[in-house]
Amino acid sequence: MLSHNRKIRIRADDTVMDFYRNEPYMIRRSRGYAPLPFMTKADWKGQVLAVGGELKNTFCIGVDNRFYPSPYVGDLEDLRTVKALQETIHRFQTLLEVKPQAVVCDLHPKYNSTVVAEELGYPVIRVQHHYAHILSVSYTHLRAHETLRH
């Protein structure tokens, strides 16, 4: 058995993909795929950070119409994972040279992701997580720019 006690400097879980109708389908974007951005056709301007949910957390930084998803962070019940979220957000902001104009978080005031959002010092936009799921599905399958403007 090979073992070492080296400190993990940058966490990176495995990416999980499957195939649907012979096309690759991303289940969890992480090592090798994050922070590769995805683009939208909508003409959005500005910088925003969405801190994600409490369970199976990832976050995303939007810069105009480019969106940079984080690697999988994990469940925020564990304070070590909360610290990893804070460190990864800081690293992304440095890497992308971003200072968000707002941070989006869950409506639930006791979620650790909400606490992290509030501690960042940016204006906070709270979104009910079921509504966030609807927007995500709308973006994936419908015309998101129309849905998001309402």
Residue ranges: model-predicted function:
Residues 1-42:
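Internal gly/pro-rich beta-alpha loop/helix module
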Residues 89-100:
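Phosphate/pyrophosphate-binding loops at sites that engage ATP/ADP/AMP, CoA/4′-phosphopantetheine
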Residues 140-150:
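Conserved small/polar residues in nucleotide/adenosyl-binding loops
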Residues 15-17, 57-62:
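Short beta-strand scaffold segments in enzyme catalytic cores
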Residues 45-52, 143:
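Two-metal-ion RNase H-like nuclease active-site motif
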Residues 62-76:
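Gly-rich Lys/Arg/Thr-decorated short loops/hinges at beta-loop-alpha junctions or inter-strand turns
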Residues 110-121:
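Short Gly/Thr/Asp-enriched flexible loops that form oxyanion-binding sites at enzyme active sites
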Residues 98-108:
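Short glycine-rich phosphate-binding loop at a beta-alpha junction
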